[in-house]
Amino acid sequence: MKFIIATNNAKKLKELERILKPLGIDAVSAKEAGVNLGEVEETGTTFAENAFIKANAAFKATGMPAIADDSGLSVDALDGRPGVYSARYCGENATDEEKYTKLLEEIQGVPDEKRTAHFTSSICCILSDKEKIEVDGICNGTISHTPNGNGGFGYDPIFDCNGKSFAELTAEEKDKISHRGIALRKLQACLLYTSPSPRD
């Protein structure tokens, strides 16, 4: 079974493809499938709702089984922000640096023990009109005082986990512990049984 990945984010697409390949999940981008998905309005109030919106749009546009990810960073000192607005936290066209710089400014002066945060990845996989799989992955960590590392994307340079920022990890190291890696391995397990799995 071949899946279409429902994203227009080139960096996220690269990471999804990198994680899916060794899991044995055959997935292609919209470009590879010769399809223009356009911009999908993410009107959900949760990661899961937005993942479904994106997967459903791709499924309806192509007729192919579709996989979509909606993810973001939730900072406890900011009452869970930026959350579902992580990608648009500093405006639609803001750079990654502008987004994480704004976040660092907002928690300036917050002590280390209160800089806890977590990344969430909600994956929706639509197999047919009547069958879908929804799974979540969560990775806990802390927000650093300064950005560190040159890898990854998004908020990776300021998210510390196990003593290093996500941006300091190799791709292989990050995939083993990241929210997205966790969620996609859950998806793989569900697909092996070819039946929807309850969210846990």
Question: Can you say where each PLM-predicted feature lies in the sequence?
Answer:
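Conserved small/polar residues in nucleotide/adenosyl-binding loops
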Residues: 193-200
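Anionic-ligand binding patches
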Residues: 2-4, 10-30, 34-192
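Alpha-helical hinge/cap motifs
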Residues: 8-9, 200
